[in-house]
C-alpha cells in the first residue's frame, strides 16, 4: 500500500517490506509493468520475520499441518498476502490445500484466531508484538510454528530480500521453543 501511495505522489515517505520494495524497483511480481526505479530506502527499521501463528487445539506444528485447516492468507494487496502467496508457491500448494481461507486484515486476524474462527494466520511483523502476545494469551493459546525445509530454503536462496530468522523462545508467553522461519526487513 505505502509503495503505491509514494508512486502516485500521495506520500513522500513510507515504510514497506524490503521484498516489496525490491519488486517495485525491479518491476517484478505484482509490480511487473509498473517499475518504480526511483524508489529508495532511507534505512532499515527492523527485521520482520514471516510468522504463522496457530491455535493450540489445531495441532499445527509445521506448514504441512495446515492442510485441511482454516487459514487467513491476508487481505488482497497486503505484504502479508504477498509473502503468504510466495510461501505457498514455494511449498507447491494453492488455496485448495486448506479447508478454507479468509482474507482478514492484520487487525482482524488475532480476534478471529482467539474466537476459534480460523486455525492459523501468516503475518510479517517485528517482535515482540502486542497482537501476537494477545494470540499467545487468549483462549487460542497460539504460538508461532517453524517454517523450515528445502522449500523454504529455496525461497530464501532465490531472493536477495529474504533471510533466515528466529523468534527466540520466551519472546511470547508460554513460547517454550525457538521458532525458525524466514523474513524481510522493514525499510
Model regions: which residues?
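Pocket-lining segment of extracytoplasmic ligand-binding domains
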Residues: 18, 29, 58, 95-187
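A glycine- and small-aliphatic-rich helix-loop capping segment at beta-alpha/alpha-beta transitions
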Residues: 31-33, 90-91
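Extracytoplasmic small-molecule ligand-binding "clamshell" domains
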Residues: 1-7, 13
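Bilobed "Venus flytrap"/periplasmic-binding protein-like clamshell domains
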Residues: 1, 44-115
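Loop/turn elements at helix/coil->beta-strand transitions in domains of secreted/extracellular proteins
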Residues: 10-12, 37-38, 68-69, 117-119, ...
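Short beta-strand-centered segments that line the small-molecule binding cleft or hinge
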Residues: 13, 22-30, 37-46
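Extracellular/periplasmic catalytic domains that process cell-envelope and extracellular macromolecules
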Residues: 7-8, 33-35, 44-46, 65, ...
